[in-house]
Amino acid sequence: ISEVKMDAEFRHDSGYEVHHQKLVFFAEDVGSNKGAIIGLMVGGVVIATVIVITLVML
């Protein structure tokens, strides 16, 4: 039973690694200019979320 569990965990970890590598490759493929725009968009969303949470708490 323990062997099967370890095998399942190993598959999960390897799948995560592949997914992470795809994300890194995509980020490099997009290029610095679009990457900066995406970064600003993500940052804006985070800031907006923080503001909304702050207003809700008040």
UniProtKB/Swiss-Prot annotation:
The record marks 13-14 as: Cleavage. InterPro entries: Amyloid_glyco, Amyloid_glyco_Abeta, Amyloid_glyco_Abeta_sf. Proteolytically processed under normal cellular conditions. Cleavage either by alpha-secretase, beta-secretase or theta-secretase leads to generation and extracellular release of soluble APP peptides, S-APP-alpha and S-APP-beta, and the retention of corresponding membrane-anchored C-terminal fragments, C80, C83 and C99. Subsequent processing of C80 and C83 by gamma-secretase yields P3 peptides. This is the major secretory pathway and is non-amyloidogenic. It is a single-pass type I membrane protein. Keywords: Amyloid, Cell membrane, Cell projection, Coated pit, Copper, Cytoplasm, Cytoplasmic vesicle, Endosome, Membrane, Metal-binding, Nucleus, Secreted, Transmembrane, Transmembrane helix, Zinc. Its main location: membrane. Gene3D superfamilies: Amyloidogenic glycoprotein, amyloid-beta peptide (4.10.230.10). The keyword Ribonucleoprotein does not apply. Cu(2+) binds at residues 12, 16, 19-20. GO terms for cellular component: cell surface; clathrin-coated pit; early endosome; extracellular region; Golgi-associated vesicle; growth cone; nucleus; perikaryon. It is found in: Cell membrane; Membrane; Perikaryon; Cell projection, Growth cone. The keyword Protein biosynthesis does not apply. Zn(2+) binds at residues 12, 16, 19-20. Residues 1-34 are extracellular. The chain crosses the membrane at residues 35-58. GO terms for molecular function: metal ion binding. GO terms for biological process: cognition. Pfam families: Beta-APP. Functions as a cell surface receptor and performs physiological functions on the surface of neurons relevant to neurite growth, neuronal adhesion and axonogenesis. Interaction between APP molecules on neighboring cells promotes synaptogenesis. Involved in cell mobility and transcription regulation through protein-protein interactions. Can promote transcription activation through binding to APBB1-KAT5 and inhibit Notch signaling through interaction with Numb. Couples to apoptosis-inducing pathways such as those mediated by G(o) and JIP. Inhibits G(o)-alpha ATPase activity. Belongs to the APP family. Binds, via its C-terminus, to the PID domain of several cytoplasmic proteins, including APBB family members, the APBA family, MAPK8IP1, SHC1 and NUMB and DAB1. Binding to DAB1 inhibits its serine phosphorylation. Interacts (via NPXY motif) with DAB2 (via PID domain); the interaction is impaired by tyrosine phosphorylation of the NPXY motif. Also interacts with GPCR-like protein BPP, APPBP1, IB1, KNS2 (via its TPR domains), APPBP2 (via BaSS) and DDB1. In vitro, it binds MAPT via the MT-binding domains. Associates with microtubules in the presence of ATP and in a kinesin-dependent manner. This is Amyloid-beta precursor protein. It comes from Canis lupus familiaris (Dog). The gene is APP.
